Amino acid sequence: QLDLRELLKRGNGLFGSAEMTGSIGVVTINMARLGYLFKGNKVELFTQLDRLLYISKSTLEKKRVFIQEMYDRGLYPYTKRYLQHFRNHFSTIGVNGMNEMIANFTENKDDITSLTGIEFAAEILEHIRNRMKEFQEETGNLYNLEATPAEGTTYRFAKEDKKRFPNILQSGQGENIYYTNSSQIPVEHTEDPFEALFLQDELQCKYTGGTVLHLYMSEKISSPEACKQFVKKVISNFRLPYITVTPVFSVCPVHGYLNGEHEYCPKCDEILIEEKKLKLSN
């Protein structure tokens, strides 16, 4: 018997994606818009957030009923071969644009990289977690909080908001506007992976569904052993559940893969220099 007074984390496999669990559906909340509409008014912001959370619950419960009905009618024959029920499946709620929410709420005095911003984001995520515990007790179904990938949603939210609220603070420029994913730091904020880890550790631990911190290494990782030691250091000193390590590289049409970031290919430059020297010597 599951204790519905606590939020569970998916077990087994990468991101807990074992065959007996998953998400019934995902609702992503546009946090940036809340920050703009209720700037400086925390009470109203939380009131509106609650309204959106209740709408999310209603939507996800209706979807669960619909999927169960389709399953019972035999319209998911392949699923029925390996899945006996949906009781271990989560109703998932996620957030997008937490960084821009803080910037709009504070009129650009803070963002998610400041201590004030981190504390505010943590307060909001904890509030969502508490509401989800209530939803679990009320419905008997599992809920989780996820850093939804929002690859398309982040652009769509920003585009819609720009039409309605021309003065809203967003990331990007011109046509390439977007909101920073979930509660991540701005993409251009730091190249130091340990600074990113310190800024994100508390917030990453608030999620009970899928979340990951991508660490882009501006310097070359010299060997698999060096990467292993780096990962060991991270998991020994930080609590966040998932990380990826991506070395920065460049691709030359002639010489292919090059370690590090290069505006111009150094191998091509060497060839050009040699050719120039030969011409000058002749």
Language-model segments: which ranges?
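Conserved catalytic cores of very large enzyme subunits
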Residues: 1-87, 108, 114-118, 122-282
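Contiguous, well-ordered alpha-helical segments that form the cores/surfaces of helical PPI scaffolds
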Residues: 91-104, 126
